């Protein structure tokens, strides 16, 4: 995937005009379906899929990490497409949930497409590739630019994982880092997958783990793992992230994880993660247990046959 290098906000005037056209849901569209050989892909043609596109900017400096997660989800309904997008900024253990919106659009043959809304604007390349994410609200502004692809993988359930160079602009300040783009889909309007994590050891190694299903179901979640290491890329078809400690979250009347043990099925990966800050939100429901979305800033260590890596990053936990 070829992407241009990050741009400064001052270059965006022409691109923003193109963005509105490129993201318009009224133009002719090709159907967007899950790919791969998994069950989600097989059922997509007969049932309406739900989609996630998640973007996370991360930059590690010393013992601290600068995180900007953007999480988006779309679900097709008979009367249209339900869309939601959420944005956070985390630094020095403090979380700012600066954007959270849900809205409906007209029925679409490409419901997975990410669209601008309100204070959320997008830069889009040919082929509907998101090239930049912009938040503007009065004097507040935050821009993410996505650069060159560093590593890219696909999964059996149609998921795609891309690691990219990137930059975040807060006003006149620029921070360079790495961007994860994780896209997932499922048939029948169900959850596209379970919990996931993005952790990195500076510029030397980045790891992504994504579960096939949520916790609390009939089957235990199994993760797939991907890594961009100094001299090679790695994949693990079976990884377990076991909870080793939990904490209560009374607003949802649930326990949520506080630390994790990582281990791969082939014993070539091992590690542990610990939450050091979090942003948790309870959803709406009839109860007694409510939905929850929890974002954790984590630290820990991941060991592979290539070496041991001190890591810092993000874990996203959801119960729907």
List where the protein language model places each region.
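C-terminal motif of bacterial Sec signal peptides marking the signal peptidase cleavage site
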Residues: 20-22
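Sec-dependent N-terminal signal peptides
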Residues: 12-18
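Structured soluble/peripheral alpha/beta segments that form catalytic or ligand/cofactor-binding pockets
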Residues: 26-320
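Bacterial N-terminal signal peptides that target proteins for export
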Residues: 2-12
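N-terminal hydrophobic alpha-helix used for membrane targeting or insertion
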Residues: 14, 24-25
């Amino acid at each position: 995937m070829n992407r241009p290098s990050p741009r400064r906000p001052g270059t965006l005037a022409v691109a923003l005009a193109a963005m509105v056209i490129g993201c318009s849901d009224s133009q002719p569209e090709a159907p967007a379906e899950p790919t791969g050989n998994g069950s989600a892909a097989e059922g997509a043609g007969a049932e309406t899929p739900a989609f996630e596109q998640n973007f996370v900017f991360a930059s590690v400096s010393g013992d601290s990490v600068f995180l900007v997660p953007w999480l988006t989800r779309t679900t097709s309904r008979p009367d249209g497409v339900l869309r939601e997008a959420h944005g956070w900024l985390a630094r020095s253990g403090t979380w700012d949930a600066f954007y959270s919106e849900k809205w409906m659009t007209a029925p679409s043959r490409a419901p997975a497409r990410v669209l601008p809304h309100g204070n959320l604007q997008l830069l889009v390349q040919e082929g509907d590739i998101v090239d930049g994410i912009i938040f503007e609200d009065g004097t507040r502004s935050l821009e993410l630019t996505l650069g060159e692809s560093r590593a890219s993988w696909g999964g059996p359930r149609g998921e795609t994982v891309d690691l990219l160079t990137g930059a975040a602009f807060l006003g006149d300040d620029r921070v360079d880092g790495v961007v994860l783009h994780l896209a997932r889909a499922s048939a029948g309007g169900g959850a596209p997958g379970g919990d996931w994590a993005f952790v990195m050891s500076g510029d030397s190694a980045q790891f992504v783990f994504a579960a096939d299903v949520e916790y609390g179901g009939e089957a235990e979640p199994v993760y797939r793992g991907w890594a961009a290491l100094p001299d090679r890329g790695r994949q693990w078809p079976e990884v377990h992230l076991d909870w080793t400690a939990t904490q209560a979250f009374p607003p949802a009347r649930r326990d949520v994880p506080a630390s994790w043990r990582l281990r791969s099925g082939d014993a070539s990966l091992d590690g542990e993660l610990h939450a050091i800050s979090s942003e948790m939100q309870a959803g709406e429901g009839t109860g007694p247990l409510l939905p929850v979305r929890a974002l954790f800033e984590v630290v820990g260590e991941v060991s592979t046959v290539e070496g041991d890596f001190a890591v810092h990053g993000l874990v996203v936990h959801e119960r729907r």
